[in-house]
């Protein structure tokens, strides 16, 4: 069994799917740890090509020998809610100004998609988490 590599740093980048380039924010974030930036960009773009148009977070682990691994997460709940509601962005004052609405069915669909990344035991709890995010963005939740 090969010896384990020593983990130096773990961080998350939210990047457009299939469009990672060595320009900021990718270049500086990886460059300061001595990681091969082009290698990351090529593998990230290849793995996220099918999700173009979404923001896909990547959790990157950098090791002592300057190698790296990354795990793709699901798109942020806020992005999925904006897409479901069909609005440009959330409200600046969500408790006073509502910018759109989402249905319970849409919430459940988003919760199913996000379930792996949420700290929830079942789908109902995940749906409540997503509903809270929707309310904090100025979206009404309708039945």
Curated annotation (Swiss-Prot):
Q: Name one GO molecular function term.
A: structural constituent of ribosome
Q: Does the keyword Transferase apply?
A: no
Tell me the InterPro entries matching this sequence: Ribosomal_uL11, Ribosomal_uL11_bac-typ, Ribosomal_uL11_C, Ribosomal_uL11_C_sf, Ribosomal_uL11_CS, Ribosomal_uL11_N, Ribosomal_uL11_N_sf
Post-translational modification (record): One or more lysine residues are methylated.
- GO CC term (a single one): cytosolic large ribosomal subunit
Keyword field: Methylation, Ribonucleoprotein, Ribosomal protein, RNA-binding, rRNA-binding
Task: Give a Pfam family name.
Answer: Ribosomal_L11
Keyword Chloroplast listed? The answer is no
Q: Which HAMAP family match?
A: Ribosomal_uL11
Described function: Forms part of the ribosomal stalk which helps the ribosome interact with GTP-bound translation factors.
Self-association state and partner proteins as the record states: Part of the ribosomal stalk of the 50S ribosomal subunit. Interacts with L10 and the large rRNA to form the base of the stalk. L10 forms an elongated spine to which L12 dimers bind in a sequential fashion forming a multimeric L10(L12)X complex.
**What NCBIfam families does UniProt report for this protein, alphabetically?**
L11_bact (TIGR01632)
Q: Which family does it belong to?
A: Belongs to the universal ribosomal protein uL11 family.
Question: Could you identify this protein by its name?
Answer: Large ribosomal subunit protein uL11
Q: Which organism is it from?
A: Salinispora tropica (strain ATCC BAA-916 / DSM 44818 / JCM 13857 / NBRC 105044 / CNB-440)
Q: Which lineage do the record's taxonomy fields give for this organism?
A: Bacteria, Bacillati, Actinomycetota, Actinomycetes, Micromonosporales
């Amino acid at each position: 069994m090969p010896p384990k590599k020593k983990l130096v740093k773990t961080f998350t980048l939210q990047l457009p799917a299939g469009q990672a380039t060595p320009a900021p924010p990718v270049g500086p974030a990886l460059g300061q740890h001595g990681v091969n930036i082009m290698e990351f960009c090529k593998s990230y773009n290849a793995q996220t090509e099918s999700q173009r148009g979404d923001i896909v977070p990547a959790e990157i682990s950098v090791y002592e020998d300057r190698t790296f691994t990354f795990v793709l997460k699901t798109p942020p709940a806020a992005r999925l809610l904006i897409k479901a509601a069909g609005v440009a962005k959330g409200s600046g004052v969500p408790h006073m100004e509502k910018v759109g609405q989402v249905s319970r069915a849409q919430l459940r669909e988003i919760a199913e998609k996000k379930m792996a990344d949420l700290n929830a035991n079942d789908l109902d709890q995940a749906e409540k988490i997503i509903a809270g995010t929707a309310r904090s963005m100025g979206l009404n939740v309708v039945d």
